[in-house]
Design a protein with these regions (language model features):
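Extracytoplasmic mature domains of secreted/periplasmic and thylakoid-lumen proteins
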Residues: 1-11
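Non-membrane alpha-helical secondary structure
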Residues: 2-3, 21, 25
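Acidic, His- and aromatic-enriched active-site or binding-groove loops in soluble protein domains
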Residues: 10-21, 29, 161
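Active-site signature of cysteine proteases
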Residues: 27-33, 37-222
Length: 222
């Protein structure tokens, strides 16, 4: 859109300048964002009370230093942090690398302890259906018509560390979307799913939520 084009032109102009970046450049970018989006609020109202952003942060009791970002890939050693090589990791954030089984167990343990989990995953494959409220990994490929008439969860392959790594290396698995794991469920066959909240509104079969199969989670978590 217009804002993207404006910022892109400004950033490219700044990058072409030799020497250090002028502080005025940052002021210009901030002024542009303010013009399009409005300035950052200095205070706002919550439950009838006026608070500053810092006051609201402190009231929530969230301590970012107590949270850890996890991933699971074999091109780096397990038990160590590394900067995940995906385009959206603009801040070069480090992730603790753990075996796939440990990653799944950690999410289950967090849910057992009453916590929820921020989840980053590939959502660009045919097994991810927001409209139907599921994210599954069928053992055999489905046609578009078969997806439309699917009335039971199909069999899924067992996902291991090697299969997951293969699709990440080939870029079949991509860094697409962040969601929120809030619970678990089982289907009539006893298969387990994570319940996620998506940010795409509530206009699907289950009010904006989705059931993510364990195999989908193991394969497509970034």
């Amino acid at each position: 859109g217009e804002l993207d084009a404006m910022l892109e032109a400004m950033v490219q102009t700044i990058l072409k300048q030799s020497g250090s970046i002028s502080p005025a450049s940052f002021d210009a970018i901030e002024a542009t964002l303010d013009a399009y989006l409005g300035p950052l609020p200095q205070e706002f109202e919550v439950n009838g009370k006026t608070v500053t952003p810092i006051q609201w942060r402190d009231q929530l009791g969230i301590h970012p230093s107590e949270y850890v970002s996890l991933t699971s890939f074999t091109h780096h050693p397990f038990g160590q942090e590394f900067i995940l090589e995906v385009p959206d990791n603009h801040a070069h954030g480090a992730f603790l690398n753990v075996p796939l089984d440990d990653l799944e167990a950690t999410v289950n343990n967090a849910l057992d302890q009453g916590y929820t989990v921020a989840w980053d995953a590939d959502v660009s494959n045919k097994g991810f259906s927001f409209r139907n409220g599921w994210a599954i990994m069928p053992e055999t490929a489905k046609t578009s018509e078969e997806w439309k008439t699917l009335d039971a969860m199909p069999a899924e392959p067992t996902v291991d560390q090697a299969a997951r790594q293969r699709d990440f290396d080939s870029q079949s698995t991509t860094d697409d979307h962040l969601m929120h794991i809030v619970g678990r469920a089982k289907d009539a066959q006893g298969r387990s799913y994570f319940i996620i909240k998506n940010s795409w509104g509530d206009g699907n079969a289950i009010e904006g939520r989705q059931f993510v199969s364990m195999e989908y989670f193991r394969h497509y978590t970034v």
